[in-house]
């Protein structure tokens, strides 16, 4: 019979863990990270992908993630100017974390009604594909 490993917690408070969980736990940050795990996106792509997220809050979160070295902003000189966002190596490393949270949600939050049936998770599909982070 397989036994589940209990994580070893060396201290009840770890400043690094606290900073990480506060960062990725901010409102809309998880949704932004999950969207960016599928590749590079323009600002308008992100607003279309994440319903209910205001332009102001998206801009604020992207700036925070950029300051943390998780997201990179690329300005493409064209007419009109194009701005793309993508995850850095540091951001891509969060893929396993986002995937684990998605799996946990699909296991334990199945009774929570989806706000929009068209936006439900694909049952049986992995939340984060290991091939999208390339």
Description of each model-found segment:
Residues 1-12, 41, 67, 72, ...:
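C-terminal regulatory/oligomerization modules of transcriptional regulators
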Residues 11-57, 63, 68, 77-79, ...:
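N-terminal helix-turn-helix DNA-binding core of bacterial DNA-binding proteins
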């Amino acid at each position: 019979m397989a036994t589940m490993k209990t994580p070893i917690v060396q201290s009840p408070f770890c400043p690094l863990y606290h900073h990480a969980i506060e960062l990725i736990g901010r409102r809309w940050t998880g949704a932004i990270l999950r969207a960016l795990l599928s590749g590079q996106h323009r600002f308008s792509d992100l607003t279309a992908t994440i319903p209910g997220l205001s332009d102001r809050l998206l801009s604020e979160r992207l700036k925070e993630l950029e300051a943390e070295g998780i997201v990179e902003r690329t300005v493409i000189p064209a007419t009109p100017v194009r701005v793309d966002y993508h995850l850095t190596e540091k951001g891509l490393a969060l893929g396993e974390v986002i995937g684990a949270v998605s799996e946990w949600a699909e296991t334990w939050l199945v009774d929570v009604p989806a706000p929009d049936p068209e936006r439900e998770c694909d049952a049986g599909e992995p939340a984060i594909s290991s091939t999208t982070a390339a």
